[in-house]
């Protein structure tokens, strides 16, 4: 990426997004774009469309997600699947419509089966049941991964999906 390229970091106030934002700044990237949830509700497709129309990002890093600990994942299952699917649909969809050069989607290792052997191999994805407590979140993240893969295969886009391992650090807002 060029140092002056317009890079939209969705979720730039969160744990991963803020680390990416800070790293890009330290490396000299000067045209970073971020919006707080208050400024841009990623669940609102029209708002996301208007944002992309106005900003025209060249690169998108999708680190935004509805996250929580074990208790929240157990109690608010519908919220986790619905909100994460909506965020992904809106951001990946507008990235495609606006011809971004590259999109980086951050998933989660919870997409792998509950009883996957260690170390986990990519090939075990979708081979056996997920951990029940975070299954809706995991299914949404699998959908995001498959959206990226499908856009790449059908349209030749450059969408990359990565699955960070368990994370903690500054700006972590999950609650157990």
Segments from the language model and where they lie:
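Active-site Tyr-X1-5-Lys
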Residues: 90, 132-163
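Short alpha-helix in the Rossmann-fold core of NAD(P)-dependent oxidoreductases
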Residues: 80-88, 99, 104, 140-141
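Flexible, glycine-rich beta-alpha linker
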Residues: 41, 111-113, 135-136, 157-176
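N-terminal Rossmann NAD(P)H-binding glycine-rich loop of SDR-like oxidoreductase domains
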Residues: 4-27
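Adenosine-cofactor binding site in Rossmann-like domains, unifying the SAM/SAH pocket
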Residues: 27-50
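NAD(P)H-binding glycine-rich loop region in Rossmannoid oxidoreductase-like domains
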Residues: 45-85, 94-97
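Conserved Rossmann-fold NAD(P)-dependent oxidoreductase catalytic core, especially the SDR/UDP-sugar
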Residues: 3, 89-134
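SDR active-site strand-loop-helix element
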Residues: 10, 35, 60-66, 103-109, ...
């Amino acid at each position: 990426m060029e140092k002056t390229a317009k890079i939209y970091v969705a979720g730039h106030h969160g744990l991963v997004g803020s680390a990416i934002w800070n790293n890009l700044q330290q490396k000299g990237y000067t045209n970073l774009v971020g919006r707080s949830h208050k400024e841009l509700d990623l669940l609102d497709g029209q708002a996301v469309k208007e944002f992309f129309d106005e900003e025209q990002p060249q690169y998108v890093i999708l680190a935004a997600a509805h996250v929580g600990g074990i208790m929240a994942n157990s109690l608010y299952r519908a919220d986790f699947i619905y909100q994460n699917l909506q965020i992904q649909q809106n951001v990946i969809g507008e990235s495609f419509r606006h011809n971004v050069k590259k999109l980086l989607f951050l998933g989660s290792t919870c997409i792998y089966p509950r009883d996957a052997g260690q170390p986990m191999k990519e090939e075990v994805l979708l081979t056996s049941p997920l951990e029940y407590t975070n299954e809706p979140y995991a299914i949404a993240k699998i959908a995001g991964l498959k959206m990226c893969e499908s856009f790449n295969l059908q349209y030749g886009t450059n969408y990359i999906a990565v699955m960070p391992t368990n994370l903690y650090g500054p700006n972590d807002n999950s609650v157990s």
